[in-house]
Amino acid sequence: MARYTDASCRLCRREGEKLFLKGERCYTDKCSVARRPYAPGQHGQGRKKMSEYGIQLREKAKVRRFYGVLEGQFSKYFEVASRRKGITGENLLQILETRLDNVVYRLGLGTSRPESRQLVTHGHFTVNGKRVNIPSYLIKVGDVIAVADNSKNSPKVKSIREIAGGKVIPKWLEFDEENLVGKVVALPAREDIDLPIKEHLIVELYSK
């Protein structure tokens, strides 16, 4: 399976803002963006002004990196979003938010999206009682996401609960912290997505 191989902190510095790829570290003074707020590389501090097209490309790259989605899959998501009723950019974000790995992260069961993706791949979660190990699996309203019974006592899950416990859960999700069970009660609205994304730039890019 294709995946990003570049260092997470370099990706954040390249985009010029935190992508929250390193979990707890992103909230401390160890964050690379806070310490070196410029692009990586020899000429990182002398970044030139970008064209309109370049700005649109960077916004798409930023969103892909937020959610850990590669180019081909992102293009497919956009095609689906453009066919749905409503605003294409908001439809796109809604699709990305309802990926299983992102829902796991939003429930506080992973300290970052990359970690949540890894936990899903390792089979630590069930959807409606069936084990699902596909991070891109799209969750629907009414779906129940739970930590698999044989994973509840694993050291990894226990440590995550200690770090992520008390996380604010989006209003489109419900979470039973005692039993480690979450439920999708609605599709996320634009105001529920707290990421610094300008989705209209992506729509403009694909419209060319």
Swiss-Prot record:
InterPro entries: Ribosomal_uS4, Ribosomal_uS4_bac-type, Ribosomal_uS4_CS, Ribosomal_uS4_N, S4_RNA-bd, S4_RNA-bd_sf
GO biological process: ribosomal small subunit biogenesis; translation
Superkingdom field: Bacteria
Any Gene Ontology CC annotation: small ribosomal subunit
Domain S4 RNA-binding: start-end pairs: 98-164
Keyword annotations: Ribonucleoprotein, Ribosomal protein, RNA-binding, rRNA-binding
GO molecular function annotations of the record: rRNA binding; structural constituent of ribosome
Keyword flag rRNA processing: no
Family: Belongs to the universal ribosomal protein uS4 family.
Function comment: One of the primary rRNA binding proteins, it binds directly to 16S rRNA where it nucleates assembly of the body of the 30S subunit. With S5 and S12 plays an important role in translational accuracy.
Subunit and interaction comment: Part of the 30S ribosomal subunit. Contacts protein S5. The interaction surface between S4 and S5 is involved in control of translational fidelity.
Official protein name in the record: Small ribosomal subunit protein uS4
Native source species: Ruminiclostridium cellulolyticum (strain ATCC 35319 / DSM 5812 / JCM 6584 / H10) (Clostridium cellulolyticum)
